[in-house]
Amino acid sequence: MATTYLTLTNSVLRELNETELTSSTFSSSRGIQTAVKDFINKGIHDIYNETGEIPLLYARTTQDLTVGDNEYSFPTDFRKADMDSFVLKPRELVTNGEFASNITSWTTGDGSPSYTSSGNGRLNLNDAAAYQAINTTVNKTYKIQVRVLSPNSSTTGLIIRVGTSAGGTQNLNTTQAVTNFREGAILNTTFTASAQTSYIYLEAPSVQLDVDYVRISRSDIATRKLTYVTYDSFLQNNKPTDDTNNSSNYSVPLRVYILPDHSAFGISPRPNTNEFTVSYDYYTTHTDLSAHGDNMSLPDRFRTLIVDRAKYYTYMLRSDPQHAQLADRDFQRKLRLLKVDYATKNDYMRSDVIGESIATNIGGRVS
């Protein structure tokens, strides 16, 4: 169980022989109690500032690209981006196609579609149908992938249609049968859009079937890693072309850079379609503890690390440098243990001479 703000505060107060707080008196703390509460958060700040890329602050996000736009803001909780993690891929057009926790964004076409928590979450169709409208580009070809399972071991197939209206068959009309009842079956096919709005329609007639996921994206967009370049390199080599007022310079993005103020990232060349998505990893800023029941993000075994840092600041407040030095020594020792657990990486030398995505292990681990 994660350690609460109240527990951390009382751990420090107890070692200082001060009056402890309760859940009812926590918000009305006074004097040294309030100072210790502040020092708890200050100590947590120190830990995260010392470790930087701590996995507990790791996050992954995506950014949909817009034709002609080359700079995009980082999330509000952004701290630091892994610039080697930027990947360009086709935009996923289906909303909530994984059915992770519900079937919102899907409209009932017939019967009573429902959500089931089986697997990672599924759309349950028991003599029912559901559909969703998606944005498409006329005359462009799209990949569609649907995984279907039969909980009652029925071989009756799932009807899958794509058209210009709900249930329309202008672009696709097929059936995916299930014979392997444990693994289910996966439909992999394509369709060419004939309208700006297309409808994906799923129907299980007179049978119960579960849909694990529905995925649709452009077939002519390949997933590729974006090459990181410095902002200076972008200014010298790419910006003049990218800023030319000519849409013929728009193309498939190849490079990514970060702005000097670290508020946004840029891609080059400017995208030539709205159907690109960029995914990347970043590290978040942490949120200060506030209420007595707030939990620290670090594992419980590092509780004393925060306590030692708060004690250090408290002793400094009391003009007690000797005890402050002892508390700091304990903090530094435990901080090294945390870095061993979370901040140590197996780094290897790489050569990017042959290709952007080829990493060559030249000399083993770099110590």
Question: How would you describe each model-predicted region?
Answer:
Residues 1-97, 104-107, 176-182, 203-208, ...:
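Glycine-enriched, solvent-exposed interface loops adjoining structured elements
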Residues 99, 127-155, 185-190, 214:
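Extra-cytoplasmic beta-strand recognition segments
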Residues 111-129:
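Short carbohydrate-recognition loop motifs
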Residues 125, 137-139, 180-182, 193-195, ...:
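Surface-exposed coil/turn segments at beta-strand junctions on protein surfaces, enriched
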Residues 131, 143-147, 159, 188, ...:
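Beta-strand secondary-structure signal
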Residues 153-164:
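Beta-strand acidic-aromatic groove motif in beta-rich domains, primarily in extracellular
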Residues 158, 186-215:
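Extracellular beta-strand ligand-recognition surfaces/modules
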Residues 167-196:
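Extracellular carbohydrate recognition and processing domains
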